Every structure is written in C-alpha cells, then in structure tokens.
Amino acid sequence: MPAQGHRLYVKAKHLSFQRSKHVIHPGTSLVKIEGCDSKEEAQFYLGKRICFVYKSNKPVRGSKIRVIWGTVSRPHGNSGVVRARFTHNLPPKTFGASLRVMLYPSNV
C-alpha cells in the first residue's frame, strides 16, 4: 500500500487587519479558512494554532525557514472568516498570503 501524505493543517488566506472606518487594528488579523463558509463551521477552529511560514536570506540555527505563530480567537461575520491574534503582528505584505491553521489543540 503506498504511503499517503496527511496534513495536520488546513490552508487559509490572510485577508486584512481588523479595522473600522478610520482606524486599523494590526494586532488582530482577519483570516479566511478554506472550506469554512459559515459561523457554525468557524466555531470548530476557535482556539486552534495558526502560523505564517516564510523563508529568509540569513539562516538562524541552520534554517532559513521562519514561523510566526498565533491562535484563532473568534469568528468574524457570518461567512466563515475568523479573527486571529499572532505573537508578532503579521506584516502588511502578507495580505493574500497562505497561512496554516493547525488541527490542534483538539477540543473534540
């Protein structure tokens, strides 16, 4: 039987920072998760770890891959978008970039 790859994460897109008409709150990012299209489906992802993986030019501890970690905090609206808070705010160049929503910690 051939080995199949299994992902422990779901792909997501960084949409924007949370904002009002005049003020932008970069501490909270809006994230659209693939396959999540309602507020009820978004409830499953609350508390899950989320990360942005990127590459740099200078290796640190032998690796050029770096990660910014965060957690999914609450739903945003009725269309499956969630709010996420990261340890370091995501830079604006990540708008539209791919994120990973880990399927842990599990609350099932």
Swiss-Prot record:
It is found in: Cytoplasm; Nucleus, Nucleolus. Belongs to the eukaryotic ribosomal protein eL33 family. Signal peptide: none annotated. There are 2 genes for eL33 in S.pombe. PROSITE patterns: RIBOSOMAL_L35AE. The keyword Ribonucleoprotein applies. GO terms for biological process: cytoplasmic translation; ribosomal large subunit biogenesis. Component of the large ribosomal subunit (LSU). Mature yeast ribosomes consist of a small (40S) and a large (60S) subunit. The 40S small subunit contains 1 molecule of ribosomal RNA (18S rRNA) and at least 33 different proteins. The large 60S subunit contains 3 rRNA molecules (25S, 5.8S and 5S rRNA) and at least 46 different proteins. This is Large ribosomal subunit protein eL33A. Keywords: Cytoplasm, Nucleus, Ribonucleoprotein, Ribosomal protein. The gene is rpl35b. One of its GO terms (molecular function) is structural constituent of ribosome. It comes from the Eukaryota. Pfam families: Ribosomal_L35Ae (PF01247). Component of the ribosome, a large ribonucleoprotein complex responsible for the synthesis of proteins in the cell. The small ribosomal subunit (SSU) binds messenger RNAs (mRNAs) and translates the encoded message by selecting cognate aminoacyl-transfer RNA (tRNA) molecules. The large subunit (LSU) contains the ribosomal catalytic site termed the peptidyl transferase center (PTC), which catalyzes the formation of peptide bonds, thereby polymerizing the amino acids delivered by tRNAs into a polypeptide chain. InterPro entries: Ribosomal_eL33, Ribosomal_eL33_CS, Ribosomal_eL33_sf, Transl_B-barrel_sf. The keyword Cytoplasm applies. GO terms for cellular component: cytosol; cytosolic large ribosomal subunit; nucleolus. HAMAP family: Ribosomal_eL33.
